[in-house]
């Protein structure tokens, strides 16, 4: 019996570590910034809407000028949904709204589940967040929007790539800093936290497997590299900094996508830093892409 216990102890420790890591990476993320479109002179409406699995989410609706806040939009029936990164909230990306709004787009931002002011206890790296994006699409349809684009950053880009195949209303996607495989990005983060690389990889795999068991789903089947090819024939525009440590497998992601696709790759730029280093060119390219496809 003593020998058996000693044999089982390492197994138990490994499983416990995997479970603890699973709870850590899926934990709720508090609101970490406080901004409103009013800071940029934009009229807006704070809204509560439902993900398609019923969870209540908090959003921010910025219609084109001259539109009723609570009714159908007047003017262009096109909108862009901006999707924030992991640990963030819609507050992070409100500064991106003015350029799109000025270009004639209605803009919608929201907090993902388990982030900011939205309900939910689990951040699932795209698996359940697909339903958040679906809910946002339904909200926009209720305001008369007919053509929708999605602009996602990092975690938000993952959600964009997983949700667009099940959202026929989405006509164009911009994915900035979206990993091909979330487990690769988590492994990199673990190494940054001083975990040995030889341990970080297996521990991440175990954490994803444990999270899969908690959700009753195989999250390995819900990696962007497996879904991005289903976006076509709608276009996708990738933005990638060559120094992005969280996306070392960008070539896999781009290869998996089907035409029409394009990529803007920049040397010497890190994770989701393109818009900071080249703000004017970023705005020009993104607006041009949506103008051509919405």
Where are these regions (language model features)?
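Short beta-strand/loop motif that positions the catalytic acidic residue
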Residues: 231-232, 237-240
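Conserved alpha/beta-hydrolase
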Residues: 97-119
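The serine-hydrolase catalytic nucleophile loop
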Residues: 86-99, 112, 249
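Conserved alpha/beta-hydrolase "acid-adjacent" motif
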Residues: 244-250
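Alpha/beta-hydrolase active-site loop
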Residues: 92, 123-143
